Amino acid sequence: MKKLKENLPSAFNRYILPNGLRIIHEPSASKVAYCGFAVDAGTRDELENEQGMAHFVEHLIFKGTAKRKAWHILNRMENVGGDLNAYTNKEETMIYSAFLTEHFGRAFELLTDIVFHSTFPQREIEKETEVIIDEIQSYEDNPSELIFDDFEDLIFLSLIHISEPTRHAQI
């Protein structure tokens, strides 16, 4: 494992494993710990015919692995007072757990199993399709979400428009 020095606060240690996996560790005396996997891909990385896939995968990873059914996944951390969750945004997809430090091994093993061995059962794909459709409809019925999207489009589209002349300038 190679230890890196980057622009992180000194309280953080950052490592890169031989397989390229990056680890950021913050030592703490707290009795509560957090562990997660972040994938540097979110909705912004989807092609037009892939829209919604990052969010869909985020839901499906909880539906089964090669050695666990969905209820095993959900109960694994809850049984020891921990929490398991995930989110997707425009920049990343994240799965994480909060737990008492004594259960780090349990949390890390579960997250690793989910990230590397999810099975995406067909019956769960069909069920989750309905859940995602409901979430999209709820999102589209929320004016504050739509206003934020419009605002973001105005900002970023104006930045693209402003920078276009310099990108295409002939020298």
Task: For each feature predicted by the language model, list its residue ranges.
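His/Glu-rich zincin catalytic helix
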Residues: M1-I73, E109
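Residue-level micro-sites within transmembrane alpha helices that shape
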Residues: A54-E58, K127, A169
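Active-site-adjacent, His/Asp/Glu-enriched structural segments that form or flank metal-binding
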Residues: I61-E145
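Short, basic/glycine-rich phosphate-binding loops at helix/coil junctions
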Residues: L154-I160
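Single conserved hydrophobic/aromatic residue that forms the stacking wall/gate
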Residues: I160-I171
